[in-house]
């Protein structure tokens, strides 16, 4: 599980 903040960071890192 990941928190909204972590998920957001992962999405940005994906790019």
Curated annotation (Swiss-Prot):
Its EC number is 3.4.24.-. It is an enzyme of class 3 (hydrolase). It comes from the Eukaryota. It is found in: Secreted. GO terms for biological process: proteolysis. Signal peptide: none annotated. Binds 1 zinc ion per subunit. Belongs to the venom metalloproteinase (M12B) family. P-III subfamily. P-IIIa sub-subfamily. The keyword Protease applies. Keywords: Disulfide bond, Hemostasis impairing toxin, Hydrolase, Metal-binding, Metalloprotease, Protease, Secreted, Toxin, Zinc. Its cofactor is Zn(2+). Residues 14-15 form the Peptidase M12B domain. GO terms for molecular function: metal ion binding; metallopeptidase activity; toxin activity. Expressed by the venom gland. GO terms for cellular component: extracellular region. Monomer. Snake venom metalloproteinase that impairs hemostasis in the envenomed animal. Its main location: secreted. Contains 16 disulfide bonds. This is Zinc metalloproteinase-disintegrin-like.
